[in-house]
Amino acid sequence: LILFTIRIPDHAILILSKDKKKFKPKLIIIEIKNQNVSGSVDEKLWAGIAIKKNYQYWLENFDIEYVFILSTYLYNLVIGNKKKYNGLSKLLSDSNIKIFYGNDINHFENIYNLIINNSK
């Protein structure tokens, strides 16, 4: 895909259907973000909405699913009460951007289920 010369995600999973009338190909983009103290990585979470739209623009023949896997610090920011992040969780949810906690004991199972559920 030519877009990957512009953007290189941490992981990309392409799901094809034998029945092309059933649904168009799906591309799951997985971005892993790690931050342990305040800094600039958290800004990439806000940018996720625009980045997903960029993928949708360039890959209009694909369904795009965008996922963040977050470190403990970032995950707590997104689900916490800090004023700066009050709307972030809602904006990501409204944009259908999923958030996974990287240290979750079921981390790999959650990703596996995401792939399986998108393969149906």
Predicted regions and their residues:
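Catalytic phosphate/metal-binding cores of nucleic-acid and nucleotide-processing enzymes, i.e., regions
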Residues: 5-6, 32, 38-43, 54-58, ...
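Active-site metal-binding core of divalent-cation-utilizing nuclease and nuclease-like domains
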Residues: 1-23
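Context-gated lysine
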Residues: 18-26, 33, 44, 52-53, ...
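Catalytic cores of nucleic-acid endonucleases
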Residues: 23-28, 34-78
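Domain-level recognition of nuclease-like catalytic cores that cleave nucleotide substrates
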Residues: 63-120
